[in-house]
């Protein structure tokens, strides 16, 4: 019996070693592939462009090469750089998630550097977000500067049970505030927190600031992204240029407390033994194989299942629900042949490219009858493109108004999806409004006409058309200007139709532009006509001030344009909001009245915001008395003199105000 035992031992050792070697190799390859960067979101500020042979382009190439070089600070996860002199100076940085390895950080930054030239071609300002890193560059100074606008809210669209909702309401904000306390005491400005969700499941939270922020600015930024994050989802995140917050019920980051897996056992040469002399030795081989093979199969099935569930959980952020109920045949009369569009645009030649939107590129074209058109070619790589394409065709084909861009045709040809609009020669409002060299062309008379035209266009959508339509993405870049500077509302990809008696709708997919979203929509997915009113109010304040809400730099303690305007109004100084380019030649009574209307539109309570019919009346009749505006929405101010996340007590007092839909404890600065 002893001899048989000695002979089984090397066999067991060999098969066990083979098993662990195979498993280790598989896991290693799995981990490497999991480190590929996962794209999340990007923004391109298309108010300033550069040309291929310009000094700015050369400076940008030098900057990106520096950030992605082998000598970059991947081990710390953060690096910034500045290249050139004004006006061609370019400033940039990368910030990797605090838990990723040096190699993962390097790969993500290198990937982002190549990706930005595709996603934001010829744009002087861009921000690209990935799960593993963020890359930013700008022609303005972005270093050590707190920016709390220009981001996005993403929610996990998986279903939430009532029991889970109760647990989430108790866990989300405390967990994120605990993570914030860790981040504020970390050199990387990075913190995580893990709490129990159920007996068998954990809850994970993560927050992070760019390390170049001061502790106070990081605290302020985290306060905003924690208070604004939806608490009624199975997972959610807010990302903006300066900080981020996220929670899930799965481990979406590497838990530093988990020790690394032990190295695989070394494979030693088994001792030479005599060949087996009995059938029992053969049976032992069969027994070993019978044990080892099922274990390998079980492990592989477990890993495959884990990959599937993890990817499905991640994908739920970005996969929209099916677009049911649309009838694209109602627009059949507008369908164009793809070859006709190719001919009109010279086969989409680069010299005809006039813009780039969220779902594709825009080209100028000329039809065979001489009609100039704008051709919107949806990107094949856009996961949302087909939904927005169908939505835009069905909606815009039924709309006819002088302040709405007119759809002339569309094309569905294989993977090609193309929209053909009337050509508007003066591009978009933001092209003039936010450019120091061009904003002078928008005197007060033109700005006032634009405000009125946009109001009439939205009124048509809400009340006067055959359909009640909520635009959901009103902003300066979606207001086109014709040859006479008349405004035309564009981009209906996010729009939704309401029923006859419907006043609001809920959605689990928050879309639009952060900074223009109303509080109830950004935090709870509730949108209505009053959501568009809020966006219109932000737009009015932008038109008056010439300042962009999505990249507003801190002034007198204000973190965004709305709070800045509210502060001036509260102190009796509304004229200080006016763009210096027009302040000497404006009708002051009209300006003050428009500031008043803008602040009425951005009030926190949707019920107190005026309807579009009332707004148009306010703009056209000076005899209408305007009510006193109340506090705007999305305002966060610490009621305690010190940093709001310094202590557990302060954190808890901060959390209570965000649980209610009304956000009653939020105050203007």
From Swiss-Prot:
Phosphothreonine sites (modified residues): 513
EC number in record: 2.7.11.-
Compositional bias ranges of the Pro residues kind: 260-274
Cysteines engaged in disulfide bonds, as pairs: 96-105, 108-133, 209-218, 221-243
Residue numbers carrying Phosphoserine: 477
Cross-referenced InterPro entries: CR_prot_dom_plant, GNK2, GNK2_sf, Kinase-like_dom_sf, Prot_kinase_dom, Protein_kinase_ATP_BS, Ser-Thr/Tyr_kinase_cat_dom, Ser/Thr_kinase_AS
Enzyme class: transferase
Source taxon at top rank: Eukaryota
Signal sequence segment: 1-34
Domain Protein kinase: 348-634
Stretches in topological domain Extracellular: 35-285
Chain ranges on the Cytoplasmic side, renumbered to this chain: 307-669
Topology term for the membrane: Single-pass membrane protein
Keywords per UniProt: ATP-binding, Disulfide bond, Glycoprotein, Kinase, Membrane, Nucleotide-binding, Phosphoprotein, Receptor, Repeat, Serine/threonine-protein kinase, Signal, Transferase, Transmembrane, Transmembrane helix
Catalytic activity: L-seryl-[protein] + ATP = O-phospho-L-seryl-[protein] + ADP + H(+); L-threonyl-[protein] + ATP = O-phospho-L-threonyl-[protein] + ADP + H(+)
Segments crossing the lipid bilayer: 286-306
Protein's cellular compartments: Membrane
Binding site for ATP: 354-362, 376
Chain segments carrying region Disordered: 260-280
Phosphotyrosine PTM positions: 421, 521
Pfam family of the protein (one): Stress-antifung
Record bears the keyword Iron-sulfur: no
Active site: 473
Complex formation: Interacts with CRKIP1 (KAPP), CRKIP2 and CRKIP3, three kinase-associated type 2C proteins.
Similarity annotation: Belongs to the protein kinase superfamily. Ser/Thr protein kinase family. CRK subfamily.
Protein name per UniProt: Cysteine-rich receptor-like protein kinase 10
């Amino acid at each position: 019996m002893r001899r048989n035992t000695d002979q089984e031992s090397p066999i067991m050792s060999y098969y066990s070693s083979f098993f662990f070697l195979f498993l280790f190799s598989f896991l290693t390859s799995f981990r490497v592939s999991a480190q590929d960067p996962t794209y999340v979101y990007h923004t391109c500020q298309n108010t300033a462009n550069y040309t291929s042979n310009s000094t700015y382009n050369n400076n940008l190439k030098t900057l990106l090469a520096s950030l992605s070089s082998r000598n970059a600070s991947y081990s710390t996860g953060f690096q910034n750089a500045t290249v050139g002199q004004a006006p061609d100076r370019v400033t940039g940085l990368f910030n990797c998630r605090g838990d990723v390895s040096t190699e993962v950080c390097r790969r993500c930054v290198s990937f982002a550097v190549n990706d930005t030239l595709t996603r934001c071609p010829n744009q002087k300002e861009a921000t690209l977000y990935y799960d593993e890193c963020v890359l930013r560059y700008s022609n303005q100074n972005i270093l050590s500067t707190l920016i709390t606008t220009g981001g996005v809210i993403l929610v996990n669209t998986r279903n939430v049970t009532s029991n889970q909702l109760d647990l989430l309401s108790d866990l989300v904000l405390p967990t994120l505030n605990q993570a914030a306390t860790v981040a504020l005491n970390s050199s990387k400005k990075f913190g995580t927190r893990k709490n129990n969700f159920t007996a068998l499941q954990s809850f994970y939270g993560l927050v992070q600031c760019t390390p170049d922020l001061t502790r106070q600015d990081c605290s302020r930024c985290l306060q905003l992204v924690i208070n604004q994050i939806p608490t009624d989802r199975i997972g959610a995140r807010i990302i903006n240029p300066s900080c981020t917050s996220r929670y899930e019920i799965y481990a979406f980051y590497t838990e530093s407390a988990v020790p690394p897996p032990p190295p695989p056992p070394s494979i030693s040469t088994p001792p030479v033994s005599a060949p087996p002399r009995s059938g029992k030795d053969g049976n032992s081989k069969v027994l070993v194989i019978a044990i080892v093979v099922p274990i390998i199969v079980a492990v592989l099935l477990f890993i495959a299942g884990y990959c599937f569930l993890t990817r499905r959980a991640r994908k739920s952020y970005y996969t929209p629900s099916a677009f049911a109920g649309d009838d694209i045949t109602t627009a059949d009369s507008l369908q164009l042949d793809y070859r006709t569009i190719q001919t009109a645009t010279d086969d989409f030649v680069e010299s005809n490219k006039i813009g780039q939107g969220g779902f594709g590129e825009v080209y100028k074209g000329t039809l065979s009858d001489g009609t100039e058109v704008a051709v919107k070619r949806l990107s094949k790589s856009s996961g949302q493109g087909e939904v927005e394409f169908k939505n835009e065709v069905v909606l815009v084909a039924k709309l006819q108004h002088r302040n709405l861009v007119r759809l002339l045709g569309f094309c569905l040809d294989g993977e090609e999806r193309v929209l053909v609009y009337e050509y508007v020669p003066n591009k978009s409002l933001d092209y003039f409004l936010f450019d120091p060299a061009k904003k002078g062309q928008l005197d007060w008379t033109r700005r006032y006409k634009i405000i009125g035209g946009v109001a009439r266009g939205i009124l048509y959508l809400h009340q006067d058309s055959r359909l009640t339509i909520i635009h959901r993405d009103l902003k300066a870049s979606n207001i086109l200007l014709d040859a006479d500077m008349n405004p035309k509302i564009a981009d209906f990809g996010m729009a939704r139709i309401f029923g006859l008696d419907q006043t609001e709708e809920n959605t689990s997919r928050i879309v639009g532009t952060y900074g223009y979203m109303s509080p109830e929509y950004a935090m709870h997915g509730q949108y209505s006509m009053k959501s568009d009113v809020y966006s219109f109010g932000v737009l009015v304040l932008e038109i008056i001030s010439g300042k962009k809400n999505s990249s507003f730099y801190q002034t007198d303690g204000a973190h965004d344009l709305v709070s800045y305007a509210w502060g001036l109004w509260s102190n009796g100084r509304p004229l200080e909001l006016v763009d210096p380019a027009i302040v000497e030649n404006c009708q002051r009574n009209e300006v003050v009245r428009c500031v008043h209307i803008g602040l009425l539109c951005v009030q926190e309570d949707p019920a107190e915001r005026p309807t579009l019919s009332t707004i148009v009346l306010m703009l056209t009749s000076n005899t209408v008395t305007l009510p006193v505006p109340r506090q705007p929405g999305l305002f966060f101010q610490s009621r305690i003199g010190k940093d709001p996340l310094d202590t557990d007590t302060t954190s808890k007092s901060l959390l209570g105000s965000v649980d209610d839909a009304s956000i009653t404890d939020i105050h203007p600065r």
